Amino acid sequence: MTGKTLYDKLWDSHVVTEYDDGSALLYIDRQLLHEVTSPQAFEGLRLAGRQPWRVASNLAVTDHNVPTTDRSQPVEDPVSRVQIETLDRNCKDFQVIEFGIRDPRQGIVHVVGPEQGTTLPGMTLVCGDSHTSTHGALGALAFGVGTSEVEHVLATQTLVQKKARTMLIRIDGQLGRGVTAKDIILAIIGRIGTAGGTGYALEYGGEAIRSLSMEGRMTICNMSIEAGARTGMVAVDDTTIEYVRGRPNAPEGALWDQAVASWRHLVSDEDAAFDRVVELHADEIEPQVTWGTSPEMVASVNRRVPDPAEESDAVRARAMGRALEYMGLEPGTPLTDIPMDKIFIGSCTNARIEDLREAAAVVHGRRVAENIRQALVVPGSGVVKQQAEGEGLDRVFLDAGFEWREPGCSMCLGMNPDRLEPGERCASTSNRNFEGRQGQGGRTHLASPAMVAAAAIHGHFVDIRE
């Protein structure tokens, strides 16, 4: 009998019933909520006269629309204010635990879940947000859902899904100096494309993945959606268990021992068969920078902007040409010659304590370049912010000319006051570089925290290995 993949084990252990069309009703262990995709779901419950089936299995956080500046004043934007106040009211009415805008635990939902122990190995977890795949780093089956599905989980704690195919992405070898988890996932997307993972559940494995911290694994799983997959995961090991140990909502005592014994089985069997296997070698991965309007438009920092005329695929060549026109770039331009206007260190991809330490190590004792109009550091949560301030990282950034902000999604997306103006170019640790993602007409270059911090100091990207 063929062994099971990690995805198979997680799926099979949560099937309530199977249907003739190949779909299955899955039990959902945890749902995370935020102010943008939950209002209609709560209103659906209200209109139907229903209550959440398991209220304690839900946690709400305000993150997308919250201002990252002074929070002693009311939220200025009327739409954002209504969404935040609506979440507050809905959570009160339905008795859902919420980390509101003034709660010290508030932050980006995909940072808060793991750090609070709300996300645990072996769980099924959903959220009305595509980057829910982040939580798969803990050996969980985690994926984003739509608002109607948010309501369905609130009402029934179940969801109908079709099982995905499986893909193993194996990264063997050791990472070179200056190469991080962000570079790994950008290199993967550059290799398989933004549609390469469509229809698959991704599992990341190999020596380089096992060597990463939990926060590095979260960065990789976070961007599974940019590779076209709804979910990505890493098998449980000692790193996973030590990360979870002592978290506020983690099991304790005998329950902890029982949980760990169960979690140890959350690995793919040696004889498990994947539908597709992709292999990269760690020593071939260099610091990455995106140059276009899709995460797959990426290259090593020491390369040049590619020429669409040299692309044999006509469709891809047209897409490259459009991207370069939007980005205001000429083919053949060294990536290190592109000047930046703004800097953003934050997002659910790279706003955890290790990310801030990585950036601060580059910034320490230096100053932001004169051509940089604004440099933001936005911690992923109040817990991260407090820890960073305890380590003095805030002073490192402030002394260098950065702004030190309150937790939130911030400049990752143009839904709050932190955004790009038309034509502005930003070096960003976030996950998407689509047209207008950070503000109408804004131009986004994705890179690791260290690379973005170095761009702030030099005014343009540099190879941090030099």
UniProtKB/Swiss-Prot annotation:
Co-factor note (free text): Binds 1 [4Fe-4S] cluster per subunit.
Enzyme class name: lyase
Entry annotated with the keyword Iron: yes
Reactions this protein catalyses: (2R,3S)-3-isopropylmalate = (2S)-2-isopropylmalate
UniProt pathway annotation: Amino-acid biosynthesis; L-leucine biosynthesis; L-leucine from 3-methyl-2-oxobutanoate: step 2/4
Residue numbers binding [4Fe-4S] cluster: 348, 409, 412
MF (Gene Ontology): 3-isopropylmalate dehydratase activity; 4 iron, 4 sulfur cluster binding; metal ion binding
Superkingdom to which the source organism belongs: Bacteria
Amino-acid biosynthesis found in the keyword field: yes
Ranges in coiled-coil conformation: none
GO biological process: L-leucine biosynthetic process
Cofactor(s) annotated in UniProt: [4Fe-4S] cluster
EC number: 4.2.1.33
Key words of the record: 4Fe-4S, Amino-acid biosynthesis, Branched-chain amino acid biosynthesis, Iron, Iron-sulfur, Leucine biosynthesis, Lyase, Metal-binding
Family affiliation: Belongs to the aconitase/IPM isomerase family. LeuC type 1 subfamily.
Assembly, per entry: Heterodimer of LeuC and LeuD.
Job description of the protein: Catalyzes the isomerization between 2-isopropylmalate and 3-isopropylmalate, via the formation of 2-isopropylmaleate.
Protein name (record): 3-isopropylmalate dehydratase large subunit
Name of the gene: leuC
